[in-house]
């Protein structure tokens, strides 16, 4: 069942670009990015943006839980929307770092780099995957070593029933 209240991909991206409630400026930024992509020779910029954002989205994430005093990290599969939120957040963080250039040029450059499997956003994604790999390797259930004496006690307890 499709939820009709879900926002489209374009609206979610425009809302991410929006600052201080300025929807018109955010929409203008989005459409100038699309125009810039068409001038660079990309036939379908909507499809291009969607595909590159899919490349940026992580499939797995990490959840931190407290077990007593220790704080452990556990791997978790992310829903597509949640992964998309991570990708957009990383994109905005990268845009905030580079203040000297124009915002639109930075967005276009980052999308072009992501289409070639490079760029800051994909580095963030692979850093997250390193954490997931760490969580997978260190949080496996470990078997307790049964001491020699305990195994002998268990064996004698079993003999009583024969």
Swiss-Prot record:
Record's keyword terms, sorted: Mitochondrion, Ribonucleoprotein, Ribosomal protein, RNA-binding, rRNA-binding
Gene3D superfamilies noted in UniProt: Ribosomal protein S7 domain (1.10.455.10)
Keyword RNA-binding: yes
Location in the cell: Mitochondrion
SUPFAM superfamilies: Ribosomal protein S7
Record's signal peptide: none
A molecular-function term among this protein's GO annotations: rRNA binding
Pfam families linked: Ribosomal_S7 (PF00177)
InterPro entries reported in the protein's UniProt record: Ribosomal_uS7, Ribosomal_uS7_dom, Ribosomal_uS7_dom_sf
GO biological process assignments: translation
Taxonomic superkingdom: Eukaryota
Main localization of the protein described in the UniProt heading: mitochondrion
Keyword RNA-binding attached: yes
UniProt GO cellular component terms: mitochondrion; ribonucleoprotein complex; ribosome
Record-stated family: Belongs to the universal ribosomal protein uS7 family.
Subunit structure as annotated in this protein's UniProt entry: Part of the small ribosomal subunit.
Described function: One of the primary rRNA binding proteins, it binds directly to 16S-like rRNA where it nucleates assembly of the head domain of the small subunit.
Name of protein: Small ribosomal subunit protein uS7m
Species classification: Eukaryota, Amoebozoa, Evosea, Eumycetozoa, Dictyostelia
